Amino acid sequence: MILKNVKLKSGEITVPGDKSLSHRSVLFAALCKGKSKVTGFLEAEDPLNTMSAFTKLGLKVRKVKPGEYEFESPGKRGFISPNVDLDFGNAGTGIRLSAGLLCGLPGVNAVLTGDGSLKKRPMGRIIKPLTAMGASILGLGEKETAPLKVEGKKLKSFRYESPIASAQIKSCLMLAAIASETDLEYSENILSRDHTENMFRFLGNKIEQISPFHFKIEPPYVLNGGEFKVPGDISSAAFFLVLGVLAKEGNLLVRNIGLNPARIGILKALELMGAKIEIRNQRMECGEPVGDLKTYPSILNKTNIPKSLIPSIIDEIPILSVAGLFAKGGFEIRHAEELRAKESDRIHTMVSNFRALGIEVEEYPDGYAFDGTSPQSLEIWKFLASGKKISILSHMDHRITMSFLIFKTLSGFNLHIDETSWIETSFPGFEKLLESCLDE
């Protein structure tokens, strides 16, 4: 266990808009013929790349002010084949969901690509079910990776049992069915994020819920323009929740955060560890639950993270693991093999960086465990506390970078993180906001 070493200014903060909802607001605005509006849009590289891709297909975009955009779409029958590749940068959500949508647009042909990191991420998980729907989609990279070549066509009715709980697979197939005006019946073994379903309902559509993890949609679909309000991203708030509960003094009130039941696993996991976090001012906006979160300095302990929580905390596991460094008894995460398919292999990345800190970590195919109190780690921590520098490798991963910036702040250790520019993919202004929270 590492000692806490930071005091906070008690006050209110806001974090950027939800990344998942920002991507989806562009996709539904594109599907809806006519005008739509979004407020609270995350102006970070990933969703902006999705927006840029659809402008090349015929979507008109006007920025009203920071975070607020107006869209005018020709509708799904009015899109054109772009004369350039659609570059999604590092946006795995953007490329997978857009691939599904474009597969269902007859006559629209496109190549979807991204940066070096994105080209390593698995695409077979969407290619296989889309192909079974009748789609024409090829992974041009090794092992069915991006670039993706799509030739839009009319798709057939489809029933799919997903082998993994994945909101990206589910949303990809939903958007393919919606674009192609066809039926989809979908089931999964654990409930994944349901932002796409909520936005779909918000537009006036019905979903037949066969069981908690099994649903069906069928045309005709209602695709009229609307106003989408994007709340703050709980995955971004998670960094400041951990900062708040591990501070020696001070409270943070993080305002206007999306509290979708499939996303609040981070709150449940932190509470299982002993964190005190209060939910205030709960309300509904555009089909999504929203509220404010207040943190209190807490004493954390090792706990068992239930398998059922893993899909809802998959993006927050790096920062949750950092919290584990300050917990009595250490930390263990299992059933999280999906971490290996993120922006980096997050299991290996976290393990290697923890080992650089001198922590004895047991790596598993689906996670890792550490107690944090070995003689070797205690010697290294004394070494770090004396001001000696140690290097942390980000592996081009924004969440790894931000997690270790929080660790550096809490511990006071002189860490050097090789590159912090990756933060721009999801949280512009992160370091400035972090600095503003500290009571010097």
From Swiss-Prot:
Sorted UniProt keywords: Amino-acid biosynthesis, Aromatic amino acid biosynthesis, Cytoplasm, Transferase
Catalysed reactions, semicolon-separated: 3-phosphoshikimate + phosphoenolpyruvate = 5-O-(1-carboxyvinyl)-3-phosphoshikimate + phosphate
GO annotation terms (biological process): amino acid biosynthetic process; aromatic amino acid family biosynthetic process; chorismate biosynthetic process
Known pathway: Metabolic intermediate biosynthesis; chorismate biosynthesis; chorismate from D-erythrose 4-phosphate and phosphoenolpyruvate: step 6/7
Positions bound to 3-phosphoshikimate: K19, S20, R24, S166, Q168, D315, K342
Cellular component aspect of the GO annotation: cytoplasm
InterPro entries (alphabetical): Enolpyruvate_Tfrase_dom, Enolpyruvate_Tfrase_sf, EPSP_synthase, EPSP_synthase_CS, RNA3'P_cycl/enolpyr_Trfase_a/b
Compartments in which it is found: Cytoplasm
Assigned EC number: 2.5.1.19
Active-site residues, Swiss-Prot/TrEMBL: D315 (proton acceptor)
Binding site for phosphoenolpyruvate: K19, G92, R121, Q168, R346, R399
PANTHER family reported in the protein's UniProt record: AROM/DEHYDROQUINATE SYNTHASE, PENTAFUNCTIONAL AROM POLYPEPTIDE
Summary of subunit composition and partner proteins: Monomer.
NCBIfam families per UniProt: aroA
Function: Catalyzes the transfer of the enolpyruvyl moiety of phosphoenolpyruvate (PEP) to the 5-hydroxyl of shikimate-3-phosphate (S3P) to produce enolpyruvyl shikimate-3-phosphate and inorganic phosphate.
The name this protein goes by in its record: 3-phosphoshikimate 1-carboxyvinyltransferase
Gene: aroA
